Amino acid sequence: MTVAPGLKKAAVLCVLRHADAFLLLQRLKPPHQGLFTPVGGKLDPYESPQQAAFREVQEETGLQPLEMVWRGMLVETSPVDYNWISFVFEAHIERVPPPACSEGTLVWVEKAELAVVPTPLTDHFIYEYLLANRPFQFDATYDATLRPLVMREELQGLSLPLIS
């Protein structure tokens, strides 16, 4: 499905956890090539965000979580073709050996390592809020080179520090 330039694309981010460990994807392709991210992807036509979350986890990991809990939203805006509305879900899973994935390499990352593994700037805030069990509505604005300009948490009206 083609989306007109500048329109937001709907997607899901699926944070897979076992206690304080996160199963993250080191991405092979843009966006965020080489960075560690939750699994996820675009919503298919007529699909709810939760249905997309279950489907994306199954497609990218082969895993089938029993429950997928909505945790927040991430809206990303830029003057180029990088405009997303992402529904962020969390699933608690067994700590299994990382399965093969065509999108990149799946790796278990411990909570203490989250600050040092390369991730998109927005993801640090997602993990912080998840670990504190706080819902969120993040709004990130980028320039034409996709350098972050502004990051806000809209539920509390907070400007968040941009440290890259």
Predicted regions and their residues:
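Conserved N-terminal beta-strand and adjoining loop/helix that marks the start
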Residues: 1-23
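Short connector loops/turns at beta-strand edges and beta->alpha or beta->beta junctions
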Residues: 28-31
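A positional/architectural concept
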Residues: 33-35
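Unchanged
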Residues: 43-66, 76-130, 152-164
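Short, active-site-adjacent segments that bind or coordinate small-molecule cofactors and metal centers
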Residues: 130-151
